[in-house]
Amino acid sequence: MALNVAPVRDTKWLTLEVCRQYQRGTCSRSDEECKFAHPPKSCQVENGRVIACFDSLKGRCSRENCKYLHPPTHLKTQLEINGRNNLIQQKTAAAMLAQQMQFMFPGTPLHPVPTFPVGPTIGTNAAISFAPYLAPVTPGVGLVPTEVLPTTPVIVPGSPPVTVPGSTATQKLLRTDKLEVCREFQRGNCARGETDCRFAHPADSTMIDTNDNTVTVCMDYIKGRCMREKCKYFHPPAHLQAKIKAAQHQANQAAVAAQAAAAAATVMTQSTAKALKRPLEATVDLAFPPGALHPLPKRQALEKSNGASTVFNPSVLHYQQALTSAQLQQHTAFIPTVPMMHSATSATVSAATTPATSVPFAATATANQIILK
């Protein structure tokens, strides 16, 4: 079985971090000296990063105002190294995926995967660098299409147990104590003032979180009790304070609503479970279809003092006969029945106490036993 996976164009290895000092207009290094990118205004900057022009690396970009960065020589060398490592990583992942697909079909021979020299930008996956056979492939950007990769872990000989994460990552919880920094302010060309812009204008760049370009708000300052001389948190103006308070109020209301919904769901579940429960007084009637058994009539008052009518009560016999007939309908086994008298007299009771020798067939049974011996 042959599996051909086409390489996917990945822009991650073309991404460069933008110099924050250059964005503020205070970088003393030139474009050829700074280790970060100095993009012109025509380039598209997202989250403090810029994508380099692939055609510029090949020397064939003919755009007048290219929205991608044309890197200088030292950054171009770094991007070329990243590109070679990314190509090796793509080939390795494609070969491993092909062999894992072959392993899923029995009878297909398992060939070792050739190893490649791994650069520092590929990652820290030890299975790629030394494993002579397969290792679990984790879906990643720029390796192979995510719809081709299996969504469940594939068990392969010689590979450590690894759980493949899902395609949808968990979303980060909204933080009410953070504000996004104005990018125009970082570039030094924000036309709005600090009291008019909806984004933060921090005076100190050290309080900016470089991961998401946000600042943490000083909650003590909002409550009017910050006594620090040099606070490391951002002190927002009045309009941003109102925005933070509104966000906190909305988050509290959402939490209360979620708790109320959870409590209502719990009560509903308990009431439904109680309604579905069977009563504890289980009777014999549950084992038979409706109408199979007649209700047991009330017992008649005793007329005789010897208690014979209590033993041979016709109503009790009627109920027992109905119960026996219902059992015969459900089971195919033959159950012999003994005829019972509907009433009993004193003579009958006295006859029951007669010794076994008075019975006609008793002597015959004894004689048969003697012959068998």
UniProtKB/Swiss-Prot annotation:
**Which keywords fit this entry according to its UniProt record?**
Cytoplasm, Metal-binding, mRNA processing, mRNA splicing, Nucleus, Repeat, RNA-binding, Zinc, Zinc-finger
What is its subcellular localisation? Answer: Nucleus; Cytoplasm
Coiled-coil stretches, from where to where? none
Tissue specificity annotation:
Expressed in the cerebellum, pineal gland and skeletal muscle. In the pineal gland, expressed in pinealocytes, not in perivascular spaces (at protein level).
- Which is one Pfam family of this protein? zf-CCCH
Q: Which SMART domains match?
A: ZnF_C3H1 (SM00356)
Q: What is one cellular component GO term in this UniProt entry?
A: nucleoplasm
* Residue ranges covered by zinc fingers (C3H1-type): 13-41, 47-73, 176-204, 212-238
Q: Which GO terms describe its molecular function?
A: RNA binding; sequence-specific double-stranded DNA binding; zinc ion binding
Biological-process GO terms, alphabetical: mRNA processing; regulation of alternative mRNA splicing, via spliceosome; regulation of RNA splicing; RNA splicing
Induced by what? Exhibits night/day variations with a 9-fold increased expression at night in the pineal gland (at protein level). A light pulse of 1 hour is sufficient to decrease mRNA levels. Up-regulation is due to a large degree to the release of norepinephrine from nerve terminals in the pineal gland and cAMP signaling pathway.
List the InterPro entries hit by this protein, alphabetically. Answer: Znf-CCCH_Muscleblind-like, Znf_CCCH
Name the domain of life this protein comes from.
Answer: Eukaryota
Role summary:
Mediates pre-mRNA alternative splicing regulation. Acts either as activator or repressor of splicing on specific pre-mRNA targets. Inhibits cardiac troponin-T (TNNT2) pre-mRNA exon inclusion but induces insulin receptor (IR) pre-mRNA exon inclusion in muscle. Antagonizes the alternative splicing activity pattern of CELF proteins. RNA-binding protein that binds to 5'ACACCC-3' core sequence, termed zipcode, within the 3'UTR of ITGA3. Binds to CUG triplet repeat expansion in myotonic dystrophy muscle cells by sequestering the target RNAs.
- Please state which protein family the record places this protein in: Belongs to the muscleblind family.
Per UniProt, subunit arrangement is: Interacts with ITGA3.
Its protein name is Muscleblind-like protein 2
Name of encoding gene: Mbnl2
